[in-house]
Amino acid sequence: MNWLILSNKLRMRQGLALLATLACLTILLSACGAETNVKKGDQFYAIGEYFDASAEYKKAYSRTAIKDKPKRAERAWKLAECYRHINYNAKAAGAYQNALRYHYPDSLALLYLAQAQQRQGDYKNALKNYEAYLELVPGDQLATNGRLGCLQAPMWKKKPTLYTIKKEPVLNGRRSDYSPALFGDEWDQLYITTTRPQIESGEISGITGIKSADIWVSKKDEKGKWEQPTSVEGGLNSEYEEGACCFSPDGRTMYLTRCTFDAEYPRYAEIYTSTRSDASWSTPQRLQISKDTQSSYAHPAVSPDGKWLYFVSDMPGGMG
């Protein structure tokens, strides 16, 4: 009998030891997995693939022990930064709150949280966080402007203007539609940039998590009403991302933005040109603005006389 009792106790101890070993291995594997996710996320983030980076940081955050507050804070911050870049404001606000809850040391988390809340119309909490940030960084212009906006927005809502802004149902799809540009002798064509599911590009953007954009066009019918947009004919659109176009004064040249793909390098935006012939647009050709190959050039706009080309860029010498 004593032998049986001792045998059972021994088995219990062995079982407990096995469970403890398995628990330690699980924690170790989870920690290793989290580090792998962070490294992958950092690689995606470095080339501007914010959506793909967010997926890795989210996994890393969930695999990090709650008691490991510094790492939880850092991974929540990285996740929030991804969401901020792609305008996922609700998710960004939640991630910044997690970073602050685990005492992330950079006060910018408080500022960015306030901005994300303001974009959602949560003026009360945004105001509170702007004021908290201003206590840490007195006189900061972004926080000062944000605070003022939160104070003014409720008053503006009580005193609406004489103008009514509404969505145009024919021109908008289920995804983003933006950068409209009128075209034609009678301005009866409207070119838009769209990410709707029907576009030609089959690739899901690692930046946004949706399809890469193409340029579509809508035309007015005999009654002067806009028709459903369709993809631009010719060789304008490709497997890459095209959008944000404008036209030369004579209507013969289109200036557009294109972002090509490279798994190893950031997606640098470049300006291309396309010429119109027989009611269709040619395959775009890159417009060399500078020998700088490490900067982006996008969102072109041509002056009325056709002599000046305005664009946005992150090239050295700017203020952004």
Task: Please place each PLM-identified region on the residue numbering.
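Short, conserved micro-motifs composed of acidic
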Residues: I47, H85, Y112, R119-G320
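Canonical positions in the second alpha-helix
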Residues: A60, N98-A99, A132-Y133
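Alpha-solenoid helical repeat scaffolds
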Residues: V38-K39, P70-K78, L108-Y112, K128, ...
